[in-house]
Amino acid sequence: TASVLLLVALIAVGMNITYALFSPTKLEKPGKCPKNPPRSIGTCVELCSGDQSCPNIQKCCSNGCGHVCKSPVF
């Protein structure tokens, strides 16, 4: 079962990377991503693949390891 979960996770990451590289439009929303706290590392998972994949005004930001949707700073 661990092998199956690892395989599914790798496929999901591969699909996200492929989508991010080959998506037809890259919408960048206004504002900047908030700075991560010093010496912090977030969850190593890709929960977004660009600002267009985040709801409302949120941006796709690095969390120190992966990417997550966060409210921007202006």
From Swiss-Prot:
This is WAP four-disulfide core domain protein 18. Its main location: secreted. Involved in the metastatic potential of adenocarcinomas in rat. Could have proteinase inhibiting capacity. Residues 1-23 form the signal peptide. Gene3D superfamilies: Elafin-like. Keywords: Protease inhibitor, Secreted, Signal. Residues 26-73 form the WAP domain. GO terms for molecular function: serine-type endopeptidase inhibitor activity. Spleen, kidney, brain, liver, lung and cell line Rat-2. It is found in: Secreted. Pfam families: WAP. InterPro entries: Elafin-like_sf (IPR036645), WAP_dom (IPR008197), WAP_four-disulfide_core (IPR050514). GO terms for biological process: antibacterial humoral response; innate immune response. GO terms for cellular component: extracellular space.
